[in-house]
Amino acid sequence: MSDTTPQASPPGASPSSPETHVIDFRAAEQLLAARDPRGALKLLDSLIAAHPESMSARLLRARAFFASAQLRSAALEFELVLEREPDNAFAHFALARTHERSGRPVQARKHFRLAAALDPQPDYVAAARFEE
């Protein structure tokens, strides 16, 4: 880890305390933003082991998988989020991007269109290509 890597689990904090989990989540966000998805995954794996129902942690882990080109793992994680939150437009859009990057255009188009239908923001609508 570099000197600029966010430190997880402050001294004196229990490895499984709620405070530690929040710090680890925020550190994972920072690592992903700093283009260190593998570092983010290390923090998120233990966080999700402690809180498997946390969809925000799972969504962040899916993004980290995508950023590190672990596309199958990313797709599985996005699908898990969508099982619990079928109206999550971002998860549909991100799953579509994952399918697109994996060379599965039919599956990608389906999720691009679902994302645009749930949240008609310009990026989602453009990707859905409704005119085709």
Residue ranges of model-derived segments:
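Structural marker of alpha-solenoid helical repeat scaffolds
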Residues: 50, 84, 101, 117-118
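Structural signature of tandem alpha-helical TPR/SEL1-like repeats
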Residues: 34-42, 68-80, 102-114
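Long, contiguous interaction/recruitment modules in multidomain scaffold/adaptor proteins
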Residues: 1-23
